Amino acid sequence: MDLQQLEEQARQAALKDIQNMLQRPGQLEKVEQYRHRIARKKASVEALLKTGMQGQLDGVRVGLKQLETCMQDVREVRRRMDEVERLLRGVPEVYDALEVVREENTKHSQYATAMENLKHIFNVDASVQKTMALIEDDKLLNAHQCLADLENSRDDLLYELHKQPKQHASDKITLKRHFEKVDTVSQELEKKLRLILSRTLNTLRKKPTIIVTALRIIEREEKNDQFALQQQKVTGFLPPGRPKAWRRMIMDVLQQSVITRIEGSKLEERADNKMWLVRDLEILRQIILEDLRVVKSLCVPCFPPHYDIFGEYVKFYHEGLSSYLDNIVRSGLEGNEYVSMMAWVTHTYPGVELMSHPDLNVDVHRQIGTLLRPEHLKALEDEYLQNMQRNFQEWMTKAAETEKQEWFTETVPDQDEEYYHTSAPVIIFQMIDQHLQVTNTIHQELTFKALVMSIQQVEIFGQTYLKNVIELKEHHFRNRDQIKYFTHYIITIVNNSQQMVELAQQMKQLYWPKSRTEHYEDFERLLATFQRIRAHAASYLLEEAFLDMECHFNDLFTAKWLASNIAVDTICVTLDDYFQDYNHLRPNNFEMVINEAQKLLAKRYIRALLSKRLSKPRAECDAITRKIKTEAKRFKLFFEKIAPKISLSDSPLDLISTLSALLSSDIELLVLDLHTLLGSYPSLNEDHLVRLFYIRNDVKAAEVREKVQDAMKSKKAMVSIAKQDCIFKEIVFSDKLW
């Protein structure tokens, strides 16, 4: 870096600092103070610089000394390497000169080994027989010692042959043939150990020393295996039969004994007992719990700690049980067997009844995982739901058909507190509730899936039910003499539909998780379906009643009507007769039918009023108005009598009096009366009003239309529209007045 440039930058920085310090006149008095402070700072920086430079120089000095030492070491190493190279030039000559000595050393080593093993070489057969006898007499430690002596002799001799520069295969074959019975003894001892270990749990209860002896032998063989493998890495020689891996053998034997124990627990098949799976699983639970208790209390003290025998046994039982149950699942389950299997796998097995029992305290999920693989468990759940769905479909199809057949019988429906009903709704939801209670013992997600599926099936049942109800109605109205108790069964259908809605809502309260929003549309669809059935059936009740009154509605606002009250009297008597049956409706349904009956009666009466059957002068219209109001009041009194507990405020029957009042109004003030009326009933149209004033022959239709149009143009939209306004939307005439 340019020193002059640095100096210039420092100078500029100093000038800038001075300018900042001497901005006010009063600061000139502190110039001497600033100068001393900067001088001290400069001295401090110079001292730091000198210290840094000194440190750098010391480092360089030390580095140079180390380089000098390294150079000296390199020269010394080079000198000694030259000396070693000079000495090694004579080694080949010495090696050739010692060839005879090496041969003699090899022979001496072989002879020494042979001398050490002469007893075993010449007494192989006797030693083998002795060892076999010891095995038969269960003197396993002595037998193993004899076997070890024989194997050591054979292995030492084979190792001497292995060390020879010129190896002859025939020598090895001869030696191995001489000791071939040793392998037979080893195999016999292994069989004996397998037999003992296959009965480990039973033996531990009676004589644990037998197991301890077997484990001591296995541990010795494990050490011999390790030594042989280590020797192979150094010399390349591995004795015959090594490694024996008897520890792995013992684990295989124990695992096989566990599998045999599990498979041997099955006592019955499905053909023998319907509860075979429940009994089988309970027996397995008891066996596994007792066996693992024995393992923890008796095996753990006998086995070496590094075997982790309790953990191994837990794994063996887990794997064996998993395979056993998987085979049962693959062979196919039926009915409640699905629930028994899933509940046992998800709750009983990992719970306090088995693995989490205080005597065992095994954390299955953390240590060994699930008993059935998640995909297998999900497949099991899907099969269970499919099976449940098939059962629901079959039962609900039969239920719908049974209900349909009952409608055509000549027996009155059952009553519950005077209300007609059938048992189908309760049975359907009891069946669903039973299934959901069962799935709740497994896990909530399965319960939710079962609930959604149940709702979907009930909705399908509802669609079939609605179709049958429509067919019933059409069949009845083609010939009303065919079905004797049509009204009674329609009442039953209304009550059943309401009960289905209530039971569905109760089911939702019990089982629908508050946090779940998916599939909620299925539940809403179910409610809508049965509300629709309820509404249809209620309308059929009134349709039948009003069909009987059709001719009397046709007599309204005719000359016959003016002369007598027969038409209205008959209408009231007919309704009263039908409402005697309607008392078998549940209170909510009765109120709905009452409201619909008022609405329908008002609509039919107003339609007759607007049907152009009368045309009278202004003087006679007052009497007509009074008669209309009297009949409207009579209708209201009739409904108050048959339904005293139901409020009739804002009744659609009030529309009759409201319209009749227009017949007596001054035609000049009609626009004012229409303002309020049209604001409350916007569906009241020009055609309706013109037809109403047809009764007054002193008013021309054109004049009425003009005033109605004026009222409609000047009317203001009201905040509140009367709820009975919809009646006018349903009154439509095909004939035109102009």
UniProtKB/Swiss-Prot annotation:
Q: What family does this chain come from, according to its entry?
A: Belongs to the SEC6 family.
Kindly name one Pfam family recorded for this protein. Sec6
Keywords attached to this entry: Coiled coil, Exocytosis, Protein transport, Transport
The GO terms describing molecular function are: SNARE binding
Q: Name one GO cellular component term.
A: membrane
Name under which the protein is recorded: Exocyst complex component 3
Domain of life according to the entry: Eukaryota
Q: What does this protein do?
A: Component of the exocyst complex involved in the docking of exocytic vesicles with fusion sites on the plasma membrane.
Write out the coiled-coil annotation as residue ranges.
Answer: 28-91
GO biological-process terms attached to the record: border follicle cell migration; endocytic recycling; exocyst localization; exocytosis; follicle cell of egg chamber development; Golgi to plasma membrane protein transport; neurotransmitter secretion; plasma membrane organization
Q: How does it assemble?
A: The exocyst complex is composed of Sec3/Exoc1, Sec5/Exoc2, Sec6/Exoc3, Sec8/Exoc4, Sec10/Exoc5, Sec15/Exoc6, Exo70/Exoc7 and Exo84/Exoc8.
